[in-house]
């Protein structure tokens, strides 16, 4: 199931609604498939924390009933962040290549403690938006960067979750772009604290929440939890800069969930980012010997993150 949130274009009544993608071009309205089970003010947390509702939707999607439900064109609606409410936003540090190259960029060796346990930081869950135009203050423009990531959305409460139990806590996956002001970030982190203001202003997530059953054919089982064979790439103004695969995470989402939940409750709607994948940002790319001049994002740039399983997330930057 691919859930998204949208408003209808060219209408005066701009009320966000939920939809379920049937194909890459068409969708059904959430209210049409379960109008007797939801209220008009339903939130994404109400959906993901209700297993009976999800079972009903899955049954309808896989039955002949789906043929009786009217479909609409995705092109006729404006996609929003699929999460209207986010309980918390954490971002991990799970790709070895990104960590190693980013440290080399600062003249540092690979940190040995990276292999001890997964780490993460809290980001601003109130600064999250979805596909489309994203407004960013000019104070963050110097060395403005993108970050190619995948996020998981937690589906139920849990504490002290073991890696073997963790997969059951994942409701779905989405694309995440953690915009970063590298100049501010590097100044802050000289104090050995952060990221802080350098990553406090803009994150985009979307366009879909793809439930984990949709990715069953991408699973690579390991003793430390599942890896996922999902191709990731990013273009800026139609030029490809980033390419990696989600299976290259050093730490699995199961291990990350287990670490986060030690003595701390997980809640439905918690979002956890994978961290930046290899080559997944200009900060890493700029350290390449093949780059003669550093590249950063600018006003009007179009950032397009592409995957082969969970959709594409496109943003256009507007500096204000």
Predicted feature residues:
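Short, surface-exposed linear segments at secondary-structure transitions and domain or protein termini
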Residues: 38-44, 250-262
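Short gly/ser/thr-rich secondary-structure transition/capping motifs
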Residues: 72-73, 132-134, 286-288
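Glycine-enriched loop-and-adjacent helix/strand subsegments that border the catalytic/binding cleft
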Residues: 83-257, 294-295
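Extended, compositionally biased non-globular segments
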Residues: 257-268, 279
């Amino acid at each position: 199931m691919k859930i998204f949130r949208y408003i209808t274009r060219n209408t005066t009544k701009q009320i966000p609604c939920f939809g379920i993608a049937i194909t890459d071009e068409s969708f059904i309205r959430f209210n049409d498939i379960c109008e007797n089970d939801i209220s008009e003010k339903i939130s994404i947390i109400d959906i993901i924390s209700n297993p009976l509702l999800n079972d009903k939707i899955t049954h309808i999607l896989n039955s002949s009933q789906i043929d009786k439900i009217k479909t609409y064109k995705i092109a006729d609606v404006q996609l929003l962040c699929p999460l209207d409410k986010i309980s918390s936003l954490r971002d991990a540090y799970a790709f070895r290549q990104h960590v190693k190259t980013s440290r080399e960029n600062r003249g540092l060796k690979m940190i040995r403690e990276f292999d001890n346990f997964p780490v993460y930081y809290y980001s601003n869950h109130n600064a999250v938006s979805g596909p489309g135009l994203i407004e960013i203050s000019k104070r963050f423009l110097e060395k403005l960067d993108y970050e190619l990531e995948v996020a998981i959305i937690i589906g139920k409460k849990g504490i002290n979750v073991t890696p073997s139990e963790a997969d059951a806590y994942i409701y779905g996956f989405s694309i995440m772009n953690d915009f970063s002001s590298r100049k501010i970030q590097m100044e802050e982190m000289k104090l050995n604290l952060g990221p802080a203001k350098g990553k406090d202003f803009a994150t985009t997530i979307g366009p879909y929440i793809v439930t984990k059953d949709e990715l069953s054919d991408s699973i690579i089982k390991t003793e430390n939890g599942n890896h996922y064979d999902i191709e990731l790439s990013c273009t800026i103004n139609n030029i490809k800069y980033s390419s990696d695969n989600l299976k290259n995470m050093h730490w699995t989402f199961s291990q990350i969930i287990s670490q986060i939940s030690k003595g701390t409750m997980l809640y439905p709607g918690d979002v956890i980012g994978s961290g930046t994948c290899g080559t997944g940002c200009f900060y890493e790319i700029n350290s390449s010997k093949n780059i003669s001049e550093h590249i950063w994002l600018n006003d009007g740039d179009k950032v397009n993150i592409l995957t082969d399983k969970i959709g594409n997330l496109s943003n256009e930057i507007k500096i204000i």
